[in-house]
Amino acid sequence: MPFDRQKIVKAVKEAKARAKPRNFTQSVEVAVNLKDIDLKRPENRFKLEVVLPHGRGKDVKIAVIADGAVAEAARKLGLDVISSAELEEIASSPRQARKLAKKYDFFIAEAPLMPKIGRYLGRYLGPRNKMPVVVPPTLTDLTPIVEKLKKTVRIQLKNNPVVHAPVGTEKMSDEEIAENIEAVLNAIIGKLERGESQVKSVYVKTTMGPAVKIEG
């Protein structure tokens, strides 16, 4: 099911036009419905990180779980830091752990802390597809990683044959959002055994607006 750029732009334009004005900037999301895929077979499920060419159009919340050099590098960039001691405190409260997992879009963690993170937070971060980006404890500059994460979306195909992904905000141009959608589609199609022939339909919508089909 090949998609023409102009048809994507047209659907984005319509989705934005049909969205009622809200007192906040709405996100734009894409839903990719798949067919002829057996999700009982683990090899057909996947997790992906897609770098959007035009970014997400809004701030991304990043927390760094670290001590020492990595924590210092994070503070220089104004990022929230969770120390190993704080990690153990959070682990003692499931409510706090869930709140933490919900609050941030991405986590960065120094490698030596990963066993603790897996033990204490894995059950909260794993299902949300938010396990940390792992860095060496000697890293002194997080800028390249942070800049990449600001443009990254994590998507996964798990139990249902549909993949959802944020692709921008209503304030972005139709063309920018369309290019972001193309990046997501190409990444998903690249993971499918029979490529685009397994794409059943694609819809785009704003947070509160109706879904608009992208005609193939």
From Swiss-Prot:
Q: Which domain of life is it from?
A: Archaea
Q: Which PROSITE patterns match?
A: RIBOSOMAL_L1
Against InterPro entries, the record matches this protein to: Ribosomal_uL1, Ribosomal_uL1-like, Ribosomal_uL1/biogenesis, Ribosomal_uL1_3-a/b-sand, Ribosomal_uL1_arc, Ribosomal_uL1_CS
Task: Indicate yes or no for the key word Ribosomal protein.
Answer: yes
Among Pfam families, the record links this protein to: Ribosomal_L1
Q: Its biological function?
A: Binds directly to 23S rRNA. Probably involved in E site tRNA release.
> NCBIfam families, per this entry?
PRK04203.1
Protein name, per record: Large ribosomal subunit protein uL1
Q: What is the lineage of its organism?
A: Archaea, Methanobacteriati, Methanobacteriota, Thermococci, Thermococcales
Q: Which gene encodes it?
A: rpl1
